[in-house]
């Protein structure tokens, strides 16, 4: 590896990235470590995070406001894709990685840095997401990954940081790893590594427990235009405000917790806890609206596309050609996804209780009704069934002869 003089480090203020600063300087001999702090709506005072980077030895620390871009270019496409990895996880953390990587590369170009770095460990998913995105956007840049090479446990990393005056934000006894952005929270490690261990209530922050959620249900109406959520109730909101409002409503009523065994990119299974109340609520509403506005064959094929889209994003291929091709298909389906969905929030549940589309509904009450207003031609069903089952009938006749 060519000697690096200046590196741009993706920095969160957590254990691994904080320890990376002295490690890069002392173990790699890099003279300038510039940190990039991504504002993804996590709610932290990022000036404190920036100052922590400087106190930890960073030459310079830059904060990038990515919230609007994160919602409009990453979260909203995921909603249109009904993206749920493993049929549960709405990619709240995974969606942030290519955006951070893109800005990391841009800052490295701006500062004429030789390399970029991140604090991802050797058995996590984020290392794959960062590396693949950086390879796609800055193939000439070196990627330095201290946490993948230092072979320290989390406890040892905390001790290493303390030698250089870096305070640990977690307890050594139960060192949870928590990642937060506007879309949600991911929690792992510590006691949660036992898949039978129930999470303590203090693990959660965005969602109420069922016991503490309101006793009275709350009905919420979400309006979509071209597959994008544009209003909650009668209030038309910006994309960021939509996520914030959905988080508040769903979280208050205890909806949006996920406890799952997840198949990581590197081939191992891990126990993951997520909170993503708003994103899960919006995906649920969007998928319901599609049920009334899209043809059955489009829905069937879109289900296949959605699964693959979610896998590609989870696996780090945001900038890959297949993901871009699937984007084109999804975009082509969304012009008719206009209307509103009513959902009842109550004690951890989000139950669809209504849906409508004024101009794009494929539901015809006069065809679906069993009342006197029914215009469906029942007599034609006999001919349809005869043709529909013809191949099965021929097969059955042939096999019945063979069995005699």
UniProtKB/Swiss-Prot annotation:
GO terms for cellular component: cytoplasm. It comes from the Bacteria. Its EC number is 6.3.4.5. L-aspartate binds at residues 121, 125-126. GO terms for molecular function: argininosuccinate synthase activity; ATP binding. L-citrulline binds at residues 89, 125, 129, 177, 186, 262, 274. It is an enzyme of class 6 (ligase). Its main location: cytoplasm. Homotetramer. This is Argininosuccinate synthase. It comes from Prochlorococcus marinus subsp. pastoris (strain CCMP1986 / NIES-2087 / MED4). The gene is argG.
């Amino acid at each position: 590896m060519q000697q690096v003089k200046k590196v741009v480090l993706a920095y969160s203020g957590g254990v691994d990235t904080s320890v990376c600063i002295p490690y890069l300087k002392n173990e790699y001999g890099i003279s300038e470590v510039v940190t990039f702090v991504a504002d993804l709506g996590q709610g932290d005072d990022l000036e404190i995070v920036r100052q922590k980077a400087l106190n930890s030895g960073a030459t310079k620390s830059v904060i990038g406001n990515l919230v609007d871009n994160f919602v409009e270019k990453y979260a909203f496409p995921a909603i249109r894709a009904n993206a749920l990895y493993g049929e549960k996880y709405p990619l709240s953390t995974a969606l942030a990685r290519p955006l951070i990587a893109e800005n990391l590369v841009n800052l490295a170009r701006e500062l004429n840095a030789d390399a970029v770095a991140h604090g991802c460990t050797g058995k996590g998913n984020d290392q794959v997401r960062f590396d693949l995105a950086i390879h796609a956007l800055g193939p000439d840049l070196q990627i330095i990954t201290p946490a993948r090479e230092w072979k320290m446990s989390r406890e040892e990393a905390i001790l290493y940081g303390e030698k250089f005056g870096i305070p640990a934000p977690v307890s050594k006894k139960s060192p949870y790893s928590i990642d937060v952005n506007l879309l949600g929270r991911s929690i792992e490690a510590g006691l949660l590594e036992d898949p039978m261990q129930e999470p303590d209530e203090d693990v959660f922050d965005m969602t109420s427990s069922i016991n503490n959620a309101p006793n009275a249900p709350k009905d919420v109406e979400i309006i979509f235009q071209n597959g994008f959520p544009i209003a909650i109730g009668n209030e038309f909101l910006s994309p960021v405000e939509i996520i914030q409002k959905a988080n508040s409503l769903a979280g208050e009523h205890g909806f949006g917790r996920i406890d799952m065994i997840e198949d990581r990119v590197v081939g191992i299974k891990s126990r993951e806890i997520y909170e993503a109340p708003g994103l899960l609520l919006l995906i649920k509403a969007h998928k319901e609206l599609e049920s009334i506005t899209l043809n059955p064959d489009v829905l069937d094929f879109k289900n296949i596309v959605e699964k693959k889209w979610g896998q590609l994003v989870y696996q780090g291929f945001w900038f890959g050609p297949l993901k871009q091709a699937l984007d084109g298909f999804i975009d082509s389906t969304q012009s008719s996804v206009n209307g509103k969905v009513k959902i009842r929030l109550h004690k951890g549940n989000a139950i669809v209780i209504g849906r409508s589309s004024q101009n794009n509904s494929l539901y015809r009450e006069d065809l679906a009704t069993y009342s006197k207003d029914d215009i469906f031609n029942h007599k034609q069903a006999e001919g349809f069934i005869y043709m529909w089952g013809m191949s099965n009938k021929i097969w059955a006749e042939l096999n019945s002869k063979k069995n005699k």
